[in-house]
């Protein structure tokens, strides 16, 4: 099984679309394990994550772990949590933050990796890019609406907002997220982690 994971990783590194990164010695940033039970899908990694080769090692990551109710060790070392961004590379900065993930990247690589993770019980969709792509929703559907209606997408998918500090105002304006959504998320994650 490890051979298949390594083959996919090598294919990602060698594909022409990623040549600009490979030439700079930049490796794709994701984590996929045959024993994974939870899959976290978010946007592309940020610049700091790419430089450190460590995802979610910032305030957003701490908040995400709090929301999930998992420890640092469970998040990074249990091998029960896969992390698959919509793009495995930091693509640069735009006018309003990091550039979005490439449109076809996840379509090409995610299915190959997911096929090797047969024990996934819950896919957590973090933010708009992941939610719209995986739930096949038009861009006109707002992330707030998606998260409010999260139960529609269970038991396979659980959409949430991005845990960025920039979303603090959103969290204050939408108290139902803390009172209704997060307890359910934590309950489901804990149940799966204890299997």
Tell what function each PLM region has.
Residues 1-148, 153-194:
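A polyanion-binding, active-site-adjacent surface
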């Amino acid at each position: 099984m490890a051979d298949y994971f390594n083959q996919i990783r090598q294919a990602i590194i060698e594909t022409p679309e990623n040549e600009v990164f490979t030439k700079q010695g930049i490796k794709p940033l994701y984590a996929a394990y045959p024993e994974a039970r939870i899959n976290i899908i978010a946007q592309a990694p940020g610049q700091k994550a790419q430089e450190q080769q460590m995802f979610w090692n910032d305030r957003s990551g701490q908040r995400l772990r709090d929301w999930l109710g998992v420890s640092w060790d469970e998040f990074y070392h249990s091998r029960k949590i896969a992390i698959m961004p919509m793009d495995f590379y930091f693509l640069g900065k735009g006018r309003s933050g990091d550039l979005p993930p490439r449109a076809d990247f996840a379509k090409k690589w995610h299915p190959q990796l997911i096929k090797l993770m047969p024990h996934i019980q819950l896919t957590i969709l973090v933010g708009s890019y992941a939610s719209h792509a995986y739930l096949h929703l038009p861009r006109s559907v707002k992330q707030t609406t998606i998260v409010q209606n999260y139960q529609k997408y269970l038991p396979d998918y659980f959409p949430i907002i991005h845990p960025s500090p920039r979303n603090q105002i959103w969290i204050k304006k939408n108290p139902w997220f803390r009172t209704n959504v997060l307890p359910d998320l934590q309950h489901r994650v804990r149940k799966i982690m204890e299997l």
